[in-house]
Amino acid sequence: MFEREEQPDLCRSAKAGLIEYRTVQLLHREGIAPSILDFAVENHRCEFRTPDESVVLEYAALTGGRPHYIYPQHQLVRRLCETLTNAGGHIRFGHTVHAVRQDHGGVVLSMDGPGGDRTEIECDVAVGCEGSSSPVARAMTGIRVSEQTLPVRWLVFLGAAPPLVNHTIYAAHPRGSAQQLRRGPDKTRYYLEIPITDTTADWPEQRVRQELAARLGAGGRLDDVPLVEFGLLDMRVRVTEPMQQDRLFLAGDAAHLITPAGGKGMNLAIQDAVELAHGLIEHFGPKHEDQRLLAYSQTRLPHIWRAQAFSNWLLHLITSLQDGREPADAAPGAGR
């Protein structure tokens, strides 16, 4: 495994943090969750707020006791890295792959190491899991990329304090949406919808506090909460079809990009990885069977399109994109 970031940076960058019930069940079936993961913090409900009313959706109760689990992505990545290396696996941190080519029945990766030394690695297959700029994706020909940029921008930041309530809040407001997402007992992720042309410079901390409190209906409860790690998030969606070509494969953000609405991205990536791992094991293991590996794209794409449609529907519901109607084109290819 080659990772472009150094391990300390990779394992402290706070990103996603909501893991679906079915993803946890999948990790349990794979024998991963019991040994390294403690899914003790659960999220059973979400709340939709407007200036006039509030509706709490008890989705766990409505689905037979199936909650989400709060597990910050950087902590999950750190535990998975530790487990892999403890089992004898190798991760080369600080290695940037800049070119990929298929050659003589294999794959050649050209990369730069931590010291800037360029080297080439030959392998049987290559799996690109490195995001939208994936060199593995660039090396694939004849693929179709469906993508869309939505006119929505979120200001993203962390609050170094417990959440207002112990569940997710989606607030729809005439000036834009706001969201509260739990990230642990003393950290909370906030999203604040801002004009598409604004930057962080347009939003000093006092303005952020006032607007967040107004949209969430928080009164003065956020006045003394330290706010850190500010950033911008534009809403882009993308799906690559197929997710494989010969000895090249894509998983996670290298294959598809989804809006943060609904917390689907990390879950899709985990589900991709498990399905692809099974295909590779059956191909290279004692079975020497190719059926599952060849069907990887066909297996995963329906789930990806369905998640895209849901995420974009939710985005339209809570943001300024909402116009009172369910969007007919909530996601590229949503009618599939």
Question: Where do the language-model regions lie?
Answer:
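Generic enzyme active-site microenvironment
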Residues: 1-2, 128, 171, 251
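Glycine-rich FAD pyrophosphate-binding loop
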Residues: 1-15
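Active-site-adjacent segment of FAD-dependent monooxygenases/related oxidoreductases
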Residues: 11-87, 98-101, 308-311
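Conserved FAD-binding catalytic core of PHBH/FMO-like flavoproteins
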Residues: 82, 99, 104-108, 112-119, ...
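General small-molecule cofactor/ligand-binding pocket signal
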Residues: 90-92
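FAD-binding beta-loop-beta segment adjacent to the flavin cofactor pocket
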Residues: 234-256
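A conserved FAD-binding loop/helix module that cradles the flavin
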Residues: 260-272
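C-terminal helical "tail/cap" subdomain of flavin- and related membrane-associated enzymes
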Residues: 263, 278-336
